[in-house]
UniProtKB/Swiss-Prot annotation:
The keyword Metal-binding does not apply. It comes from Bacillus subtilis (strain 168). GO terms for molecular function: hydrolase activity. This is Putative nucleotidase YqfW. Its EC number is 3.1.3.-. SUPFAM superfamilies: HAD-like (SSF56784). It comes from the Bacteria. Belongs to the 5'(3')-deoxyribonucleotidase family. PANTHER family: NUCLEOTIDASE YQFW-RELATED. Keywords: Hydrolase.
Length: 193
């Protein structure tokens, strides 16, 4: 049994979740392909302060209404049979109830959900003895792979195209992620003392 660390937004939720909200709020017509940087202030031509004001007003409804990524549910249902599913997200802690309600509404299994309130997930990864992490944020993937010394499956997106470490595996969807995991399971099995 492996302890799988899994990000939420852009990993089990659709990567274009924010697009309709951004388009409506900022009177734009962007698509996911226009989001070539995780920092949306550049695309929106606004300051960090303006962005976080917008997030404070909108993130609860965005997370509440987020759609699942393609094949995420069936893949997670398969993985839960053999592994612990530990979700580690950058969401802030005031979103705890909305997060749990979303998981229940989507009927997504979890063994634990941790909202770390920022993009530094390494401490939580180490605390939970994660064997493999699933992520969409390039910076998080690099940090986890290097500092926690574990493989990271990085879900390909227009905003994470920077070069990657040898401990990071790019996939296009959940089917590819599960296939890679099944093909490499023997390398990942935790040695129990």
């Amino acid at each position: 049994m492996l302890r799988l660390g899994i990000d939420i937004d852009g990993t089990i939720t659709a990567q274009d979740t924010f697009v309709p909200y951004l388009n409506r709020s900022f009177n734009l017509s962007i698509s996911l392909n226009d989001m070539t940087d995780y920092d949306l202030t550049k695309l929106l031509n606004i300051t960090q302060e303006e962005f976080w004001d917008w997030m404070n007003q909108n993130e609860a409804i965005i997370y509440k209404e987020a759609l699942l990524a393609q094949h995420a549910k069936q893949s997670l249902d398969l993985l839960k049979e053999e592994h612990k599913l530990i979700y580690i997200t950058a969401r802030r802690t005031h979103l705890t109830d909305i997060t749990y309600e979303w998981f229940d509404r989507q009927n997504i299994h979890y063994d634990h959900i941790e909202l770390v309130g920022g993009h530094h997930k390494v401490e939580a990864v180490k605390n939970h003895n994660i064997d493999l992490f699933f992520e969409d944020h390039h910076g998080n993937a690099m940090m986890i792979a290097k500092e926690a010394g574990i493989p990271v499956i990085l879900f390909n997106s227009p905003y994470n195209q920077l070069p990657i470490d040898s401990n990071i595996i790019r996939v296009n969807n959940w089917l590819e992620a599960v296939q890679w995991m099944n093909n490499n399971k023997h390398h990942l099995i935790r040695v129990n003392n």
